[in-house]
Amino acid sequence: MEEVLETMQLENMHCDVCEGTTFQEREGFYYCVECGTQKDQIRAVDITAEDNFDDTAAGRYTARTIRQKKDTEKEDEDDITSWEFYNYVLRGFLQELLNMGAKPELKLMTLQVWAAYLDSMEVAFSKSNKTGLPKLNVRALPIDARIIYNHKTFKKGKKGKKSTLTGDPNDERAKFRLWNRTKRNLDASGYRSHGGASESEGEQSLHLQWSMRARKSLKRHMPLKHLDKHSRDSKGSMSCHSLRPRVKQLHNFDRNIYCLNIIKLYVVLGIALNMVEDDIQLSDLLRFIDEEHLTKRCMLNYLPGNVAAKGKALLKDMELSKMKDKVTNKLLRVNIACMSRFINLSEYQKPNLHSLAERYILELALPPRLLKYVNSLLDLHPPTFFNAMTVHPYPRYEARTMAYILYAMKLLFGLDDLKERNISESAAKINEKLLEVGGDEAPLLFVFTEWMEFVEMRKVIVSHYNQSFARRFGVSTRTGCQVDDILAKEWKEKEQGETFGWMQGSAAMKRQHENLTHIIETMLKDHFGESSKESMEKEHIEFQPSLTPAHSYFNRILLQVSRSDGAKMKITIPDHMKVDHSARNLDPFVLETTELSQYLSQHGLKLRVEELACQEDIQNVGIFRPLTIIRGDGREYRANTEIKTETWISELKRKEKRPDFRFTQPTGTYGARYLKRITMRDARRVQLEINNPFWDVTETPSFLLKLNDNEIPLDSLSSLQTFEEGTMDPLNIPLDLPRRNLEKILNPEGSDRASDQVASDINDEPPSPETLLLQVSNFDCWLLHGYMKRIRRHDKHELRQLFPCSFRWLLETCASTIGIVWEELYEELLIVEVMYHHSIRDWSNHRNYLCIQHNTQEKDIRTLARTYKELW
């Protein structure tokens, strides 16, 4: 009769060949039922107790199953270094960007930038590395030293005395447990040592190799000879020095370059996007990171299956818990500048500012006519983005483009809390008349105040469904919306994490988590009638990545509301939010009133245009500047120990404190001697430009018009011959003679009869049509200039209070649109305004050349212009 063997299923154990989970025990070993393969990691051990412990049969003989550790060789096969880990993650991020619509050339450019970075780090692609092994850098991870050089780290022992047996020394149960544990350890040690090779035979450690920068950094803490001893210490027995200096002990450049983390991947992608001139700019990359389209939550999905199976242990080895996932615009630009300098990048590629301005105008829901006006400003004097103050700075392309849009809105509407209101009121009245005579198809004018209400309400609506959008624009949302956003991310992370099982933990923790979740879900179901997942899915809208988030997200919400299931949504869209302000007419505000006047004349209306100037009561505060504290080196301080408290306090009150932020009037002038010197330099510069054969400045050609078989230069014609009298628009064909009779009158009687005839004609004319008044800007605006460098938080608050409310709102809205603070955008606006208002010498002669003025006696204005000229 054959022996019937019992089968059993071991927890968290499976066959290495067929992945089976059912095993049979034969002579102390376990074999898979499906394929018959022996499981080496487990073994049955018989434990027999002595007679003095227990007289029962169960006490004399016990069968147990012990688990052996996996072979270290198999574990090392699945281990990867930090460079390999981030290489997989970088490939995953790159694929995400390609799915979002990035150029295919981004793949090759990312590889080139990443290879250049690893080459400079002496990790790979290095010709000077003869051994071919990657060299360790500053703050190298222990897993890299263990995998590459088989180097073990020194682990400090626990403080305190060793644990000893406590309680009654004659306790039989304690003695039995001690004997049982010793027996198991002996059996396990014999099983491990059977047939195994010794450590000295199978494992050979190599000396640690450090990069040049790492040796220079570690040399501050120990001599190089002592560092070599640490490099030869394969078992990590030396505990005198740490081979990982603290972060605060490193220089700023070492921290930003040699400490490999997830931010370096964002930097590599940012440089590659700029090199291929992709539509995705740095601000878009930051928004994708903030919206978690690129996040470390999905890192394990980018790794191979055998590597990702380690889960939390792998993330712990990479020390990802100590790294920040979100980055700011300033931090990323600083890291890009450092890496560009590190890999010897020649220069950045300037993106197409015209297409960038078109995208931002669409995002702000502004009319396309504004794009034509902004493009004319860009073409008038194109920016070079050359910064002569710092090395390898990443230019603010997005901020400069947005500054041009802000400057154009400032010219068209004034933004002084009075001019834009008057312009909007006159445009709103004309729109009411246009709706009466033309209906819904009438060409309505752009109203600035209505557009402000639309943009502000759009912020609130989109923020209700997107918490990242709410944080960027500073919109406060309900706690329920924030909880739903957290739950959506947790559910998404759980779905991705369950593939590898790294989030489940132990069985007890899993059961505890399931029980708590079930209790809370039951309470929510009883109280609110729906679970948390049902509530989240009802109000949750999944937004796809977009380069115009506000425009795309709002249209997505409108589409959801228009559907049949949109009635379940708690939010209500007002009717005025369905108005397309980008389709409004902006031509009359740039003095192109021909089409509007013709349309009104067809309906018996007349248009009168009135230009508005800036406010007269604008405060003249001057130029603002932060004061730097100059500390003298040769100062001597003496303490007066005999002074009384009252005397000391009175002296402090009498002492005048110098402010750190002030406004000064531009009244400074140069001395006669220095002014003569700069005048001579300017004359010498002009003479050199004239004598330079490569300096070709041609005058604007004069156009000839043929009138009555005579060729007449266009510049010689008067305005009465080339422009219309009513609107001063250029004529298609110039007049031969002015329409007004300017000859001298020789017959006074004839003149009297002519005047009587004109009077009779006026009396016979029908009554004058209704006149509509349209107020526009005279293209003059207020200026508040100064120096934004090294300005403090309190100074920014003081400066912000001087801005008009409308300008302050538009400044912060435009800054939040591209993900920066308002100070950076205002600094770019100052660069544009100072160039156009103070630096260009003669606008009337700009057809020949644009010359930055050098010989001016206004010292403060010249200093301001020269400072911002270096940033143009």
UniProtKB/Swiss-Prot annotation:
Keywords: DNA-binding, Metal-binding, Nucleus, Transcription, Transcription regulation, Zinc, Zinc-finger. GO terms for biological process: nucleolar large rRNA transcription by RNA polymerase I; RNA polymerase I preinitiation complex assembly. Residues 187-206 are annotated as: Disordered. InterPro entries: Rrn7_cyclin_C, TAF1B/Rrn7, TF_Rrn7_Zf. One of its GO terms (molecular function) is zinc ion binding. Residues 73-84 are annotated as: B-linker. A zinc finger (RRN7-type) spans 6-40. Although it shares weak sequence similarity with GTF2B/TFIIB, displays a similar subdomain organization as GTF2B/TFIIB, with a N-terminal zinc finger, a connecting region (composed of B-reader and B-linker regions), followed by 2 cyclin folds. This is TATA box-binding protein-associated factor RNA polymerase I subunit B.
